[in-house]
Amino acid sequence: MENTIVIKLGGVASDNLTEGFFRQITEWQAANKKIVLVHGGGHYITKMMEALAIPVETKNGLRVTNKATLEVTKMVLIGQVQPAITTAFQKRNISVIGLNASDTGLLEADRLSDTDLGLVGKITKVKTNLIEQLLSENIITVIAPLGINSEHDWLNVNADTAACEVASALHAEALYLLTDVPGVKNGSEIIGEIATAEIEKLQSTGVIKGGMIPKLASAAFAAENGVGQVIITDSLNNSGTKIKNKVAIG
Protein backbone atom coordinates (compact mmCIF):
# COMPACT_ATOMS: atom_id res chain seq x y z
CA MET A 1 0.00 0.00 0.00
CA GLU A 2 1.23 3.46 -0.80
CA ASN A 3 1.93 5.67 2.21
CA THR A 4 2.29 2.68 4.54
CA ILE A 5 5.05 2.68 7.15
CA VAL A 6 5.87 -0.46 9.14
CA ILE A 7 7.70 -0.13 12.45
CA LYS A 8 9.22 -2.98 14.43
CA LEU A 9 9.45 -2.10 18.11
CA GLY A 10 12.45 -3.44 20.01
CA GLY A 11 12.51 -6.20 22.60
CA VAL A 12 12.09 -3.59 25.34
CA ALA A 13 9.17 -1.99 23.53
CA SER A 14 8.56 0.67 26.17
CA ASP A 15 12.00 2.14 25.43
CA ASN A 16 10.75 3.07 21.95
CA LEU A 17 7.51 4.69 23.11
CA THR A 18 8.89 8.16 23.79
CA GLU A 19 7.10 11.45 23.25
CA GLY A 20 9.29 11.94 20.18
CA PHE A 21 8.03 8.60 18.85
CA PHE A 22 4.39 9.62 19.24
CA ARG A 23 5.04 13.06 17.73
CA GLN A 24 6.44 11.38 14.62
CA ILE A 25 3.46 9.03 14.45
CA THR A 26 0.96 11.90 14.62
CA GLU A 27 2.94 13.86 12.01
CA TRP A 28 2.84 10.88 9.68
CA GLN A 29 -0.87 10.42 10.24
CA ALA A 30 -1.45 14.11 9.48
CA ALA A 31 0.37 13.48 6.19
CA ASN A 32 -2.01 10.56 5.48
CA LYS A 33 0.53 7.85 6.26
CA LYS A 34 -0.78 4.47 7.40
CA ILE A 35 1.06 2.90 10.34
CA VAL A 36 1.62 -0.77 11.19
CA LEU A 37 3.63 -1.91 14.21
CA VAL A 38 5.16 -5.32 14.85
CA HIS A 39 6.42 -5.66 18.40
CA GLY A 40 9.11 -7.76 19.98
CA GLY A 41 9.22 -8.71 23.63
CA GLY A 42 12.39 -10.70 24.15
CA HIS A 43 13.38 -8.86 27.34
CA TYR A 44 10.04 -9.57 29.00
CA ILE A 45 9.94 -13.18 27.78
CA THR A 46 13.38 -13.81 29.27
CA LYS A 47 12.36 -12.23 32.59
CA MET A 48 9.24 -14.40 32.79
CA MET A 49 11.17 -17.55 31.87
CA GLU A 50 13.74 -16.82 34.57
CA ALA A 51 10.95 -16.23 37.10
CA LEU A 52 9.47 -19.62 36.16
CA ALA A 53 12.90 -21.32 36.20
CA ILE A 54 12.69 -22.20 32.51
CA PRO A 55 16.15 -22.33 30.86
CA VAL A 56 16.83 -19.61 28.29
CA GLU A 57 18.76 -20.66 25.19
CA THR A 58 19.52 -18.89 21.91
CA LYS A 59 21.17 -19.91 18.66
CA ASN A 60 22.37 -17.42 16.05
CA GLY A 61 20.31 -14.69 17.69
CA LEU A 62 17.08 -16.75 17.73
CA ARG A 63 15.34 -18.09 20.84
CA VAL A 64 15.33 -21.89 21.09
CA THR A 65 11.67 -22.67 21.74
CA ASN A 66 10.21 -25.78 23.37
CA LYS A 67 6.56 -26.13 24.43
CA ALA A 68 7.07 -24.36 27.75
CA THR A 69 8.96 -21.50 26.12
CA LEU A 70 6.25 -21.14 23.48
CA GLU A 71 3.51 -20.91 26.11
CA VAL A 72 5.43 -18.20 27.97
CA THR A 73 6.09 -16.37 24.69
CA LYS A 74 2.39 -16.34 23.77
CA MET A 75 1.39 -15.23 27.25
CA VAL A 76 3.90 -12.39 27.41
CA LEU A 77 3.50 -11.08 23.84
CA ILE A 78 -0.31 -11.19 23.66
CA GLY A 79 -1.15 -10.71 27.34
CA GLN A 80 1.51 -8.26 28.53
CA VAL A 81 3.53 -6.49 25.86
CA GLN A 82 0.83 -5.83 23.27
CA PRO A 83 -1.73 -4.37 25.72
CA ALA A 84 0.96 -2.08 27.16
CA ILE A 85 1.67 -0.75 23.66
CA THR A 86 -1.97 -0.26 22.66
CA THR A 87 -2.73 1.44 25.99
CA ALA A 88 0.12 3.90 25.39
CA PHE A 89 -1.49 4.87 22.07
CA GLN A 90 -4.95 5.10 23.59
CA LYS A 91 -3.67 7.47 26.29
CA ARG A 92 -2.80 9.84 23.44
CA ASN A 93 -6.17 9.40 21.71
CA ILE A 94 -4.62 7.50 18.80
CA SER A 95 -6.86 4.76 17.37
CA VAL A 96 -5.11 1.40 17.61
CA ILE A 97 -5.88 -2.31 17.69
CA GLY A 98 -3.77 -5.32 18.69
CA LEU A 99 -3.66 -8.36 16.40
CA ASN A 100 -2.11 -11.82 16.46
CA ALA A 101 -1.91 -14.84 14.17
CA SER A 102 -5.28 -16.21 15.29
CA ASP A 103 -7.12 -13.12 13.98
CA THR A 104 -8.45 -14.25 10.57
CA GLY A 105 -5.35 -16.46 10.26
CA LEU A 106 -3.28 -13.29 9.96
CA LEU A 107 0.20 -14.84 9.90
CA GLU A 108 0.68 -18.30 8.41
CA ALA A 109 3.97 -20.02 9.18
CA ASP A 110 6.00 -23.18 8.68
CA ARG A 111 8.51 -24.59 11.13
CA LEU A 112 12.14 -23.78 10.34
CA SER A 113 14.28 -26.60 8.98
CA ASP A 114 16.79 -26.15 11.83
CA THR A 115 15.19 -28.54 14.32
CA ASP A 116 17.60 -27.42 17.06
CA LEU A 117 15.52 -24.24 17.33
CA GLY A 118 12.40 -26.19 18.25
CA LEU A 119 9.01 -24.54 17.72
CA VAL A 120 10.32 -21.61 15.70
CA GLY A 121 8.74 -20.71 12.38
CA LYS A 122 9.02 -18.55 9.32
CA ILE A 123 6.09 -16.54 8.00
CA THR A 124 4.86 -18.04 4.72
CA LYS A 125 1.85 -15.79 4.14
CA VAL A 126 0.50 -12.53 5.51
CA LYS A 127 -3.25 -12.16 5.05
CA THR A 128 -3.38 -8.43 4.48
CA ASN A 129 -7.15 -7.92 4.09
CA LEU A 130 -7.82 -7.19 7.76
CA ILE A 131 -4.76 -4.95 8.07
CA GLU A 132 -5.73 -2.99 4.95
CA GLN A 133 -9.30 -2.58 6.17
CA LEU A 134 -8.13 -1.19 9.51
CA LEU A 135 -5.59 1.12 7.86
CA SER A 136 -8.29 2.47 5.55
CA GLU A 137 -10.11 3.56 8.72
CA ASN A 138 -6.91 5.20 10.06
CA ILE A 139 -6.52 2.60 12.80
CA ILE A 140 -2.94 1.68 13.67
CA THR A 141 -2.41 -2.08 13.82
CA VAL A 142 -0.07 -3.64 16.38
CA ILE A 143 0.93 -7.21 15.52
CA ALA A 144 2.51 -9.89 17.73
CA PRO A 145 5.32 -11.97 16.11
CA LEU A 146 3.74 -15.41 16.25
CA GLY A 147 2.57 -17.66 13.44
CA ILE A 148 0.17 -20.57 13.02
CA ASN A 149 0.90 -23.51 10.72
CA SER A 150 -1.43 -25.61 8.58
CA GLU A 151 -2.15 -27.89 11.58
CA HIS A 152 -3.18 -24.80 13.58
CA ASP A 153 -0.17 -25.10 15.86
CA TRP A 154 1.48 -21.92 17.12
CA LEU A 155 5.09 -21.10 16.27
CA ASN A 156 7.48 -18.52 17.67
CA VAL A 157 8.68 -16.10 14.98
CA ASN A 158 11.56 -13.66 15.13
CA ALA A 159 10.03 -10.18 15.37
CA ASP A 160 12.37 -8.66 12.78
CA THR A 161 11.47 -11.42 10.33
CA ALA A 162 7.76 -10.92 11.00
CA ALA A 163 8.02 -7.15 10.49
CA CYS A 164 9.87 -7.61 7.20
CA GLU A 165 7.31 -10.11 5.93
CA VAL A 166 4.45 -7.77 6.85
CA ALA A 167 6.20 -4.79 5.22
CA SER A 168 6.85 -6.79 2.05
CA ALA A 169 3.28 -8.07 1.86
CA LEU A 170 1.98 -4.51 2.20
CA HIS A 171 4.59 -3.08 -0.22
CA ALA A 172 5.38 -0.52 2.46
CA GLU A 173 7.16 2.68 1.52
CA ALA A 174 9.37 2.37 4.62
CA LEU A 175 10.30 -0.13 7.32
CA TYR A 176 11.92 0.96 10.57
CA LEU A 177 13.59 -1.78 12.62
CA LEU A 178 13.92 -0.17 16.04
CA THR A 179 16.56 -1.70 18.28
CA ASP A 180 18.70 -0.78 21.30
CA VAL A 181 21.56 0.63 19.21
CA PRO A 182 21.50 3.64 16.85
CA GLY A 183 22.43 1.54 13.81
CA VAL A 184 24.79 -1.18 12.60
CA LYS A 185 28.24 -0.52 14.03
CA ASN A 186 31.72 -1.19 12.72
CA GLY A 187 33.66 -0.78 15.92
CA SER A 188 32.34 2.44 17.43
CA GLU A 189 31.20 3.92 14.12
CA ILE A 190 27.67 3.73 12.75
CA ILE A 191 27.56 2.44 9.17
CA GLY A 192 25.33 4.83 7.21
CA GLU A 193 24.39 2.44 4.40
CA ILE A 194 24.82 -1.26 3.71
CA ALA A 195 24.15 -2.94 0.37
CA THR A 196 22.45 -6.31 0.64
CA ALA A 197 25.36 -7.81 -1.34
CA GLU A 198 27.75 -6.75 1.43
CA ILE A 199 25.99 -8.44 4.34
CA GLU A 200 27.61 -11.87 3.99
CA LYS A 201 31.09 -10.32 4.05
CA LEU A 202 30.23 -8.22 7.11
CA GLN A 203 29.10 -11.38 8.88
CA SER A 204 32.14 -13.46 7.88
CA THR A 205 34.51 -10.72 9.09
CA GLY A 206 32.72 -10.42 12.42
CA VAL A 207 31.40 -6.89 11.92
CA ILE A 208 27.88 -8.19 12.51
CA LYS A 209 27.13 -10.94 15.01
CA GLY A 210 24.56 -12.18 17.49
CA GLY A 211 21.08 -10.73 17.14
CA MET A 212 22.21 -8.40 14.35
CA ILE A 213 22.67 -11.41 12.02
CA PRO A 214 18.96 -12.31 11.66
CA LYS A 215 18.08 -8.61 11.78
CA LEU A 216 20.19 -7.81 8.71
CA ALA A 217 19.04 -10.95 6.90
CA SER A 218 15.44 -9.85 7.43
CA ALA A 219 16.21 -6.29 6.38
CA ALA A 220 17.84 -7.54 3.18
CA PHE A 221 14.76 -9.64 2.39
CA ALA A 222 12.52 -6.59 2.79
CA ALA A 223 14.80 -4.37 0.68
CA GLU A 224 14.75 -6.98 -2.10
CA ASN A 225 11.00 -7.61 -1.88
CA GLY A 226 9.12 -4.41 -2.45
CA VAL A 227 9.85 -2.24 0.59
CA GLY A 228 10.86 1.29 -0.40
CA GLN A 229 13.49 1.81 2.29
CA VAL A 230 14.67 -0.16 5.32
CA ILE A 231 16.26 1.59 8.31
CA ILE A 232 17.85 0.03 11.40
CA THR A 233 17.92 2.58 14.22
CA ASP A 234 17.04 3.22 17.86
CA SER A 235 14.64 6.10 17.11
CA LEU A 236 12.32 7.27 14.36
CA ASN A 237 14.15 10.59 14.60
CA ASN A 238 17.65 9.18 13.98
CA SER A 239 19.05 8.33 10.54
CA GLY A 240 20.46 4.94 11.61
CA THR A 241 21.69 2.46 8.99
CA LYS A 242 19.88 2.21 5.64
CA ILE A 243 19.81 -1.20 3.95
CA LYS A 244 19.99 -0.84 0.16
CA ASN A 245 19.03 -3.44 -2.42
CA LYS A 246 22.15 -5.21 -3.80
CA VAL A 247 24.11 -2.24 -5.17
CA ALA A 248 27.47 -2.01 -3.44
CA ILE A 249 28.18 1.22 -1.59
CA GLY A 250 31.28 3.09 -2.72
Swiss-Prot record:
One of its GO terms (biological process) is arginine biosynthetic process via ornithine. It catalyses: N-acetyl-L-glutamate + ATP = N-acetyl-L-glutamyl 5-phosphate + ADP. Keywords: Amino-acid biosynthesis, Arginine biosynthesis, ATP-binding, Cytoplasm, Kinase, Nucleotide-binding, Transferase. One of its GO terms (cellular component) is cytoplasm. It comes from the Bacteria. Its EC number is 2.7.2.8. Substrate binds at G41, G42, R63, N156. One of its GO terms (molecular function) is ATP binding. Belongs to the acetylglutamate kinase family. ArgB subfamily. HAMAP family: ArgB. This is Acetylglutamate kinase. It comes from Listeria monocytogenes serovar 1/2a (strain ATCC BAA-679 / EGD-e). The lineage of its organism: Bacteria, Bacillati, Bacillota, Bacilli, Bacillales. The gene is argB.
